[in-house]
Amino acid sequence: MTSDRPVAPLLTVKQVIPRVRDGAVGRDRLNERLTSATSRLTVVVAPAGWGKTVLLSSWAASLGPDAKVAWLSLDEEDDEPVRFWRYLIGALRTASDGVSAAVLEALMAPGLRPLDLAVPMLLNELAAASARRMSWSSTTST
């Protein structure tokens, strides 16, 4: 399901968790809230310059080297839908074995509305991966 049209490569630096600089202000209470969150998704919202990146990168570092974290840094160039989804899918693939290359291929498929094909595939793969993890954790905890 590959396309013949040329595709710009993804910038892998956008998927690298920024290193926390020495002297960065610690956010122990917020780090604890992130660590103890029970939902599968946490949204962090604050104005520019209020420490979101520092908070999330320090939290990700606190999870240890084996933690799987999908990180994506976006800029104004990433507001084109297919470009955005390519980056998001790429970031999710770094953190989850449950997201296949077929999703990226679907996004670039000729003759179709790519988001109509790729986004449902991605959501189905994430749901299946989540179900497998839940099934595995329930069998290991009994």
Which stretches of residues belong to each language-model region?
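Catalytic acidic motif of RecA-like/P-loop NTPases
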Residues: A127, T139-T142
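Phosphate-binding P-loop
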Residues: E32-L41
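P-loop (Walker A) phosphate-binding loop of NTP-binding proteins
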Residues: P47
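Hydrophobic anchor at the beta1->P-loop junction of P-loop NTPases
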Residues: V44
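Conserved adenine-nucleotide phosphate-binding loops and their immediately adjacent elements
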Residues: T2-R33, A101-L107
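Conserved phosphate-binding/catalytic loops and adjacent sensor/switch elements of nucleotide-binding enzymes
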Residues: T38, W50, V54-M134
